[in-house]
């Protein structure tokens, strides 16, 4: 065991110094450079550092432990065992107390069972109490979830002897969760515990220097002891992750018995990521050919199929709900439904102790920190990871993948679907994978622009959410923004996940195009090509995934009919809505209707169904209602509202009152024909939301778009959109989008030649004609249009298409009257004799039609329910 103190500064080996911001940022984020950073920080003088190697992590005896003990060690290193040993020794008398803070209810229950099993008695959980306020009498040894800290009485909060924070980085991430209520109070109480408890123990596999430095500020560096262990159990030490370059979805698609109608699209596709080609011309239910099946050899599904037929037990992780159903369907077809356990947000929980009863376990991020499967039951693991704006971040993916502690074959097959990582010019990769190569391995033409993007991101983060000054939230907001905003980049997401896997001593290799090719280490020069292959493959598999999804939905519908699970009729649904007070209130606020039976037309019913299936739709309803209210104002009225909101304190402006009017009461959705209330989470960044929506109102007013009156056949001049967006970007649109949407837009002024080269190299944007995927239209558009497309899609669910019409308007030019033909010629400044006939004017217009193509136009496809909005605003308070 090596023990050293922070007073000495070791010689640098050049490794950390050689890292540029873009190369080092992932390692810094997850504490891979923790020892070097602490030992070279003068402010950490007096801190003690204990490096352990070759054995499970151990803690010093309680009598020799400094007030703050920080333990950084990989998954499977024995952190929980060391904690129990420490607590057993410390809690040697009944008068000593402890509070253990967790990030999830499942983690609390799991830790409670582990304590009981190992003889650590006397602990209660916040779930055991009938009283809301937890008092000293029964809860001096308490396991509590972070959000429930507010239930602890003040007298009890100040008297705990030891605070334990297992999975401390997950606790930190919880401060940014949309489920976090009373953020400032919880932040204050947690910080108070960190300051006042006699002992603090913080543990995690990814403890970073930011956390240790924060604890040193709160308690003094001389009171901090850091234990860093590189030990991992055999289950991780010998594990190898093979990144597949093909999914092979044609294999499960060949097993389905239902065919989707032509043009049916996966619900998972984001509105901001339209299909790469028009699927409406595809034949209904395209046949799966022998060539399609042959092409799956060596793919994700091929490897899974082989192992199932060989009788192996397999666990499968999926980062999306939709794919978890697809892979569970496939495994059930190969084996039997009874052999497969599916765990996702729509299925009941099953204790990990029961997993060994199944040949296949498929799970999503519902299985995360605090839940582990330790038995040597599974031979192989498969993982499907899809980075997307609304999906789990790579830390959540890594945590979920690590729940299975032992694999008999020590092999993990991973496929990354990068079809939703919609990069340049809207988004730019900025992380260079340190596990592939150091700064010197990356060419300067990639390294320099990547560093530039990192520095701009840091500047944008530093100015975001300035009204949140609490210690924990403000200190870790950049980490949170980085983990969320990088989900738009295949390169950045893979680089973060690669760093996390390497942190746990898992070797990562990639498989090439040839099925018989061995997995090889990833090289810098091959990385861009590999990302490009992944994108090509992801798009080519879309039609197969749509086919399987449709089949699963049809089979589920047939099953419900067989077991007589009858949903209400349309008339019964409307009657239930008309009798529901929350539904009537919702109808009045958003649509200006009483909520009577006749008010529930098809667009509103469809909206409520969508809110039941896709929670994001509820936020879009609020956003669109606020935009409609802003667009309904006169020019003078909006000028006053906008100016006042810009200079008012947070929450006090008229515009803030509009937001509160729509957010204060629950919305109502329909789940299987029955009304359910939907609470809109008030997450950190609400100030960013109001600022972003104000900017959108200004853009909408400038281009003439209004939700209730917009004609989908109307064309919008791209030049008008570009001017409006340029003004919004200059006013801070990028910062507002980062605060609320967690998106890091690349501003048009940043798009220099080197930045575009970076996008081409790491953007995974190449397409393959063999799969019917032509060049992306988005690449031909200006960056302002690309940002506009993403904003309107994500905020309002509006699809934006490039108009294919040669001439303005929806009427065929041949059918126009002479005065209309003359108006079109005047518009492009083409002279004509006043005595010209209709035929002559038409011919002259056709000769000059190329002049119209120089002015591209857009079509906005607005959801039908938007036309029902009332644009209501809260009534002004009457003066006494």
Curated annotation (Swiss-Prot):
Amino-acid positions noted as binding ATP in the UniProt annotation, renumbered to this chain: 73-80
Functional description taken from the UniProt entry: Functions as a docking protein to recruit essential components of the viral replication machinery to viral DNA origins. In the presence of the major DNA-binding protein, opens dsDNA leading to a conformational change in the origin that facilitates DNA unwinding and subsequent replication.
PROSITE patterns: HELICASE_ATP_BIND_1 (PS51192)
Subcellular location: Host nucleus
Keywords, alphabetical: ATP-binding, DNA replication, DNA-binding, Host nucleus, Nucleotide-binding
MF-aspect GO terms: ATP binding; DNA replication origin binding
Residue span(s) of domain Helicase ATP-binding: 60-225
Region (Disordered) location: 260-287
Cellular component, GO, one term: host cell nucleus
Key word DNA-binding present: yes
Annotated signal sequence range: none
Species the sequence originates in: Psittacid herpesvirus 1 (isolate Amazon parrot/-/97-0001/1997) (PsHV-1)
Gene Ontology BP, a term: DNA replication
Gene3D superfamilies for the chain: P-loop containing nucleotide triphosphate hydrolases (3.40.50.300)
InterPro entries, A to Z: Helicase_ATP-bd, P-loop_NTPase, Replication_origin-bd
Subunit note: Homodimer. Interacts with the major DNA-binding protein. Interacts with the DNA helicase/primase complex-associated protein and the polymerase accessory protein.
Name by which UniProt lists this protein: Replication origin-binding protein
Similarity remark: Belongs to the herpesviridae OriBP family.
């Amino acid at each position: 065991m090596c023990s050293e103190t922070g007073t000495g500064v070791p010689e640098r080996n050049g490794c950390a110094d050689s890292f540029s911001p873009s190369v080092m940022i992932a390692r810094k984020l997850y504490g891979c450079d923790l020892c070097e950073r602490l030992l070279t920080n003068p402010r950490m003088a007096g801190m003690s550092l204990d490096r352990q190697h070759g054995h499970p992590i151990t803690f010093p005896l309680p009598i020799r432990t400094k007030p703050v003990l920080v333990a950084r060690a990989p998954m499977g290193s024995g952190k929980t065992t060391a904690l129990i040993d420490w607590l057993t020794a410390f809690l040697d008398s009944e008068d000593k107390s402890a509070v253990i803070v967790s990030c999830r209810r499942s983690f609390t229950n799991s830790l409670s069972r582990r304590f009981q099993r190992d003889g650590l008695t006397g602990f209660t959980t916040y779930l055991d109490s009938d009283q809301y306020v937890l008092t000293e009498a029964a809860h001096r040894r308490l396991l509590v979830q972070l959000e429930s800290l507010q239930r602890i009485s003040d007298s009890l909060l100040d008297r705990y002897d030891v605070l334990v924070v297992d999975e401390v980085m997950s606790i930190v991430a919880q401060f940014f969760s949309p489920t976090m209520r009373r953020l400032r109070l919880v932040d204050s109480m947690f910080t108070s515990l960190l300051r006042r408890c006699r002992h603090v123990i913080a543990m995690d596999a990814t403890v970073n220097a930011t956390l240790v430095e924060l604890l040193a500020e709160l308690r003094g560096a001389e009171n901090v002891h850091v234990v860093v262990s590189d030990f991992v159990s055999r289950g991780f030490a010998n594990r190898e992750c093979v990144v597949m370059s093909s999914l092979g979805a044609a294999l499960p698609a060949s097993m389905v018995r239902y065919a989707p109608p032509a043009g049916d699209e996966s619900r998972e596709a984001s509105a901001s990521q339209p299909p790469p080609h028009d699927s409406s011309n595809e034949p209904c239910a395209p046949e799966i050919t022998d060539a399609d099946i042959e092409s799956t050899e060596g793919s994700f599904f091929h490897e899974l199929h082989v192992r199932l037929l060989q009788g192996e037990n397999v666990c499968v992780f999926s980062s999306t709900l939709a794919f978890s159903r697809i892979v569970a369907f496939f495994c059930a077809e190969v084996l039997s439904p009874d052999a497969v356990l599916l765990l996702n947000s729509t299925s009941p929980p099953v204790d990990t102790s029961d997993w060994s009863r199944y040949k296949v376990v498929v799970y999503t991020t519902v299985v995360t920190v605090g839940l582990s499967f330790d038995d040597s039951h599974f031979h192989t693991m498969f993982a499907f990871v899809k980075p997307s704006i609304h999906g789990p971040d790579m830390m959540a993916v890594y945590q979920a993948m690590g729940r299975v502690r032992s694999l008999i074959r020590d092999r993990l097959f991973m496929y990354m679907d990068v079809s939703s990582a919609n990069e340049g010019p809207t988004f730019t990769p900025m992380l260079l994978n340190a596990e592939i190569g150091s700064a010197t391995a990356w060419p300067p033409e990639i390294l320099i622009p990547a560093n530039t993007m990192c520095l701009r991101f840091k500047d944008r983060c530093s100015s975001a959410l300035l009204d949140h000054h609490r210690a924990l939230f403000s200190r870790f907001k950049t980490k949170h923004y980085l983990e969320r905003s990088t989900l738009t980049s295949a390169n950045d997401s893979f680089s973060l996940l690669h760093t996390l896997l390497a942190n746990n001593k898992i070797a990562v290799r990639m498989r090439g195009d040839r099925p018989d090719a061995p997995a090889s280490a990833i090289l810098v020069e091959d990385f861009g090509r590999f990302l490009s292959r992944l994108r090509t493959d992801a798009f080519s598999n879309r039609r197969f995934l749509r086919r399987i999804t449709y089949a699963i939905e049809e089979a589920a519908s047939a099953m419900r009919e067989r077991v007589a699970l009858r949903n209400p009729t349309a008339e019964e649904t409307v009657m239930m809505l008309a009798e529901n007070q929350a539904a009537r209130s919702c109808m009045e606020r958003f649509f200006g209707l009483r909520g009577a039976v006749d008010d529930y037309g098809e667009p509103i019913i469809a909206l409520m169904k969508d809110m039941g299936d896709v929670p994001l739709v509820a936020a879009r309803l609020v956003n669109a209602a606020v935009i409609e209210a802003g667009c309904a104002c006169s020019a003078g009225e909006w000028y006053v509202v906008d100016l006042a909101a810009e200079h008012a304190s947070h929450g006090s402006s008229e515009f803030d009152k509009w937001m509160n009017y729509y957010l204060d009461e629950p919305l109502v959705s329909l789940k299987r024909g029955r009304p359910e209330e939907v609470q809109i989470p008030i997450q950190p960044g609400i100030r960013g939301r109001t600022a972003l929506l104000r900017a959108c109102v200004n853009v909408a007013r400038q281009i003439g778009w209004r939700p209730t009156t917009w004609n989908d056949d109307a064309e919008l001049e791209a030049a008008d959109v570009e001017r409006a967006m340029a003004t919004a970007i200059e006013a801070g649109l990028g910062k507002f989008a980062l605060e609320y949407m967690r998106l890091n837009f690349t501003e048009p002024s940043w798009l220099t030649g080197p930045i575009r080269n970076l996008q081409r190299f790491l953007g995974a944007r190449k397409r393959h004609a063999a799969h019917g995927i032509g060049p992306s239209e988005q690449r031909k558009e200006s960056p302002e249009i690309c940002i506009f497309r993403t904003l309107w899609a994500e905020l309002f669910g509006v699809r934006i298409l490039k108009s294919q019409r040669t001439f303005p308007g929806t009427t065929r030019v041949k059918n126009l009257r002479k005065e209309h033909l003359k108006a079109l010629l005047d518009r492009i400044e083409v002279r004509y004799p006043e005595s010209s006939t209709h035929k002559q004017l038409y011919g002259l217009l056709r000769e000059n039609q190329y002049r119209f193509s120089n002015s591209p136009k857009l079509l906005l496809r607005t959801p039908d329910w938007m036309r029902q909005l009332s644009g209501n605003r809260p009534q002004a308070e009457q003066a006494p």
